[in-house]
Amino acid sequence: MANQRKIINDPVFGFISIPTGLLYNIVKHPILQRLNRIRQVGLSSVVYPGAQHTRFQHSLGAFHLMSEAIKHLTAKGNFIFDSEAEAIQAAILLHDVGHGPFSHVLEDTIVKGVSHEDISLMLMERINKEMNGQLNLAIQIFKDEYPKKFLHQLVSGQLDMDRLDYLRRDSFYTGVTEGNIGSARIIQMLDVKDDQLVVESKGIYSIENFLTARRLMYWQVYLHKTSVAYERMLISALLRAKELASKGVELFASPAFRFFLYNNIDKEEFYHNPECLENFIQLDDNDIWTSLKVWSTHTDKILSTLSSGMINRRLFKVEVSSEPASNEHIEELKDIISAHLGIHREDAHYFVSVPRIEKNMYDPADDSIDILYNDGSIKNIAEASDMLNISLLSKKVRKYYLCYQRLQ
């Protein structure tokens, strides 16, 4: 008799069991396998060298947590059909399939206005056609068009399996222990009330830890000033490459990457031209790094300086402040940099970037988690928690970054 499941050894959760059939067919599908070639945390390895883990590993981890959540919810008497269980497992495996290399950078440069969520859905529908409609229910739940709302919340919500995995995993691989949330404990505390996902009141401390960990990970890892500077360099390099391509300058690029460099692709085009999706699924981190390596010796001074800086970790200098940099200071920097590099003054903007980043420590729209008490009453975490100072956490933290080319 054929083996009924495949077992994958994961450093974070141990052995992950994947049943043969639809779910295993998704795991080995080329579109999911492509995520093996895309890092989960983009450029964060410039700060945390251990952060080499991939979006594929994250998808498997989220799948494992979903399997655990199904087990605990059904043990508490919440009825989930086998077909629904398989559908939410399929949906979580595919939830990140629309990410490109350095996803948010691409959304700002070469695939403008098309979010990875849009592309994930397009790819799910494409795989669904190949699989003769076996993903119909998964897509319905993913789009929140299925009557049982809590199933969608498990895939995409305040306490979804995506978040529970990436915090644990990113914490593990970066070594930033603050993100190491008690995902197993949270999953054991999950329940369903009035078709909404809730957490039993005895799990409240785990939720407080989860919310705090999430915010700490944002500032310590995802929005770390050095990672932000590195990302800004990549955005500048890609925008310069795009400008040169529009003037007909020959640039080294893989066929898929070339398609996006030499064509202007917006949301409308992406939806209606099948070539866009075909080329997109051929893109991974290797396309970008290979081009940067070759561009580092390009005759265009701007492109070669940015590319070699990326390759050799000569990063933009970065200053963080609670106030934006003055226009005079920015213009003065552009004067100095253009003179130092011997480039036209109007091209100096490639070497100075002033992103503003803001984040609520607690966002009611994003973090509203319901706590279920023994008497059946429900309170929002903001009311239920005696530890989280919600009014303080709800204040927006706004940081102004000034990233610019080093002069030596």
Predicted regions and their residues:
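Histidine-centered, transition-metal-coordinating active-site segments
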Residues: 1-87, 101-107, 111-408
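Short active-site segment of divalent metal-dependent hydrolases/proteases
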Residues: 94, 98-99
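Short alpha-helical catalytic segment bearing the HExxH-like zincin motif
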Residues: 88-93
